[in-house]
Amino acid sequence: MEKGYALTSKKYRSVYEIVATETPGIIKHMKKILRYSQKDGECLEQERDVWELDKFEFPLRSNPIKNVKTINFKGISQITIRKEVKTVIFMHLKYMAIGSIMAEMVATKRFCRYLALRYPKIISLLDLTRDIMESYLIYLQTEAKERKNYRSDLYGLRRVIEDVGNHYDRQDIKNLFISTDFPSTPRYLFKFYSDETIKKLNENIFQMDEQIARALILHQLLGTRISDTLTLKTDCLSIRENRYFIRIEQVKSITFEKAISDEIAQLIIKSIDYTEEHYGKTKYIFVKKEDPLRPFQYSMLQHRVMQMIRKNDIRDENGELLNFGTHTFRHCYGKKLTEMHIDDWMIARLLGHKTLQSVHHYRKIGNKIMADETRAVREKIDMILMDVVKEWDGYEI
């Protein structure tokens, strides 16, 4: 309408220095009223265009620290493709993590937008050809700017397309992709914080809300993923042979135990006591104030830390405002283990890895530090050797 309410609005988020697009409050309330007024009828949840995940009766593999409530298929404009994708995603809900399914949805919606623009006559994934897929691969490499690497994106898209083929008994769909379609895994060096940066961060973390501070300090001391720290349960501690052990139930991987110091155990006990005093008996140690049945949400923790960084003007070694990431603490933990000359299997166990596949990344961090710290000495030795070589008769450099 010409003078109606805007469906979106712009809001400057000073913490991240970005202008975000969001739905105005009045529109959110109107949508809630509309959904409430609509009759359920005989329509199954998996037939709707927006699925409310709590309406499915089977258990879902969700990440407790991420607040995913719905799966929205409206971004797929092709009606037949939308139906096909719904069928596959419903199957995936039975055994895949919600995070992986959301990644599939992002990849599929991106592909469907491309089809609508370049191949509007394609109305079903069963109509795809190898030529269309090759054109899409070229588009990703030359025009798409949404991410640096589309490897995982393409794997998610392939799962959806091939499972559509399996469901409709079209085995030829599996020939749409070949192994060389997928970009190689990007080579990168893990980021980490210097000891000075960690010191600055912790000095200010200690001034934050006490339970948030405990969560962040434990996160550093345990070397876990942030999802594993925030989902620590109140019964995670045990004592064997006069030593404390902690049970870590990894959201993304295996459950494992490791020994911890008395100091770390006391910090955990203090965190449990705080939660019990304020919220009673709970499942998780670090709980959401508005809903103690749920753990701290990652978005809340990230926002609070970014606020603290801006307020206290914490900067990195290059003078830039610190770019905070909780996983960097895990990198620092792994780096310290390599510097202690611990063998790879022990490092993998302490990090909760099932294999040695990722340990070499932490070794690279350690090697880089060694190179940086010894560069001045090595350059001085090189200069001495160069002077000696120059004095050799008949020797050319």
Model regions and ranges:
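Active-site-proximal segment of tyrosine recombinases
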Residues: 229-230, 324, 334, 341-353
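Catalytic-site neighborhood detector that most strongly recognizes the C-terminal catalytic loop/helix
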Residues: 249-254, 351-382
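C-terminal secondary-structure termini that scaffold catalytic or DNA-interacting sites
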Residues: 272-275, 279, 375-397
